């Protein structure tokens, strides 16, 4: 069942979602040795990332993976990795590990074996933002 939450404005939404994510990450870190945090790209989660990166968590135990990356090199302006590097993988969260969803294969299909091997060892996903 989906539970829709309403917020009075964008600032309240960002604050409350960020607080919930930080709490969920903290709980996951307490329960597991390492956690995986799956996040979307694009500009929408940017304000959340701006605040979340400041939380005092054991970021060294957090691996971050995009759940909607494009098949473009990470340095491309179209890559969601750029957003993560600029807005989430900074400040306290700079200690987190980033799991890339891109490799040197010509197509996503050809890259699956390499990416699958890299990702499977980190599963399951502990906290998901979508």
Model-found features: residue ranges?
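N-terminal glycine-/serine-/threonine-rich phosphate-binding loop
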Residues: 1-37
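Glycine-rich beta-strand-to-loop/alpha-helix junction loops that act as flexible
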Residues: 39-44
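Short amphipathic alpha-helical segments
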Residues: 49-52, 77-78
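A glycine- and small-aliphatic-rich helix-loop capping segment at beta-alpha/alpha-beta transitions
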Residues: 51-59
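Ligand-binding beta-strand-loop-alpha-helix segment within the catalytic cores
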Residues: 60-127
